[in-house]
UniProtKB/Swiss-Prot annotation:
An annotated GO BP: positive regulation of transcription by RNA polymerase II
Coiled coil ranges: none
Location of the protein in the cell: Nucleus
Keywords, comma-separated and alphabetical: DNA-binding, Metal-binding, Nucleus, Receptor, Transcription, Transcription regulation, Zinc, Zinc-finger
Domain NR LBD: 1-215
Residues annotated to bind 3,3',5-triiodo-L-thyronine: 36, 85
Main location: nucleus
GO molecular function, one term: thyroid hormone binding
UniProt name for this protein: Thyroid hormone receptor alpha
Task of the protein: Nuclear hormone receptor that can act as a repressor or activator of transcription. High affinity receptor for thyroid hormones, including triiodothyronine and thyroxine.
Gene: thra
Length: 218
């Protein structure tokens, strides 16, 4: 709806507001969005071979990063909107007021910068695999195996990019910088989630949303 994020909200500790109506609308699409990240991970053979505990840590760590990437690559410069979960087009202020605060700016800025890369579905999938297989997540036991998995995806990614022959100078290192940007978005969201927990009624949080983000380190 066009008026999402426009009604009066609750002030949060970092100076912006949570529009509870907008927050409620966003939570309706969060569960299927998280489920799609899980489904993606399960399709990767190397992920399925990891211990269950490591799988959970990796999924919790990358979930916001991958959801942000999927939104960012659907940035429309003409309308200045992102499409969330493939169905909800939102403007920067709507996403900000719906609970994400400054994280909204980071996702929109990423969307603007990614537009020049013109990534295809395979490149987005490989980028998601690289984010998923991050061996520096706290608590992992199979660190070496996960690191080798990520290296495999990075090599495949670089090979595919060279095959596509993008016209942007230094395309590969510039794209890898976006991994750093997405990691920062994930870290910022972990902090924002604490604000959302304080400002929004608990019943508005879907169980899967809580399960994924409640125990993340800030």
């Amino acid at each position: 709806p066009e008026d999402i994020g426009q009604s009066p909200g609750v002030p949060t500790p970092d100076g912006d507001k949570v529009d509870l109506e907008a927050f409620s609308e966003f939570t309706k699409i969060i569960t299927p969005a998280i489920t799609r990240v899980v489904d993606f991970a399960k399709k990767l053979p190397m992920f399925s071979e990891l211990p269950c505990e490591d799988q959970i840590i990796l999924l919790k760590g990358c979930c916001m990063e991958i959801m942000s990437l999927r939104a960012a690559v659907r940035y429309d410069p003409e309308s200045e909107t992102l499409t969330l979960s493939g169905e909800m087009a939102v403007k920067r202020e709507q996403l900000k007021n719906g609970g994400l605060g400054v994280v909204s700016d980071a996702i929109f800025d990423l969307g603007k910068s990614l537009a020049q890369f013109n990534l295809d579905d395979s490149e987005v999938a490989l980028l998601q695999a690289v984010l998923l297989m991050s061996s520096d997540r706290s608590g992992l036991t199979s660190v070496d195996k996960i690191e080798k998995c990520q290296e495999t995806y990075l090599l495949a990614f670089e090979h595919y990019i060279n095959h596509r022959k993008h016209n942007i100078p230094h395309f590969w290192p510039k794209l890898l910088m976006k991994v750093t940007d997405l990691r920062m978005i994930g870290a910022c969201h972990a902090s924002r989630f604490l604000h959302m927990k304080v400002e929004c009624p608990n019943e508005l949080f879907p169980p899967l949303f809580l399960e994924v983000f409640e125990d993340q380190e800030v």
